[in-house]
Amino acid sequence: MKKLTWSIGMMAVLVFGLIIPSTFAGSSNDEGYSPEMKAKIEETKKELKKFTDERALTAKHLKTFDELDFVVFTNQEWTRLHESHSKDVKVNWPDGHSTKGIDKHIEDLKAMFVYAPDTNIKVHPVKIGSGEWTSVIGVMAGTFTKPMPIGNGKFIQPTGKKYSINMCTMGHWKDGVMVEEWLFWDNATYMKQLGIGN
């Protein structure tokens, strides 16, 4: 973190201390400087562009993720999941298992709405990222109002209890979509709030 802060600080010093004064003097940005200084200025320009491009890419990914949770997930618009997930996306779930492919991911997401049809994510209190990586904290909420399938034709009957849990999603993005996603939440708290945990 200190290294990143220092690098940004140095870029700012060079940009504002060297480039801008020469601009106000009516000369080109690197006119009158030694070859070494010109090289440093060009290097700083490239670093600054790299930094601003990365920030823009991160902002784009986070905007896509907002749309994913607030609209696509909450409203079960599964035909739009490809806007944020690659066809062969790998998804890592809180219980440790992983799945491959968008169709399987849609199937798993649909299952969450079978017993809690009002499941939703409407807020992202924390959103951070760096280039092709993002991490978002959300609040997932809903009400256990329908029978929960547990296999072999068996069901857990609804308790009518509401749940609201903090969750975190980390995403690795390529070409505008996630190629891998990590989901984190406390399953014990989730079950307890649904009224079926110890």
Place the predicted regions along the sequence by residue.
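C-terminal and inter-domain tail/linker signature
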Residues: 4-6, 22-198
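Bacterial N-terminal signal peptides
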Residues: 9-19
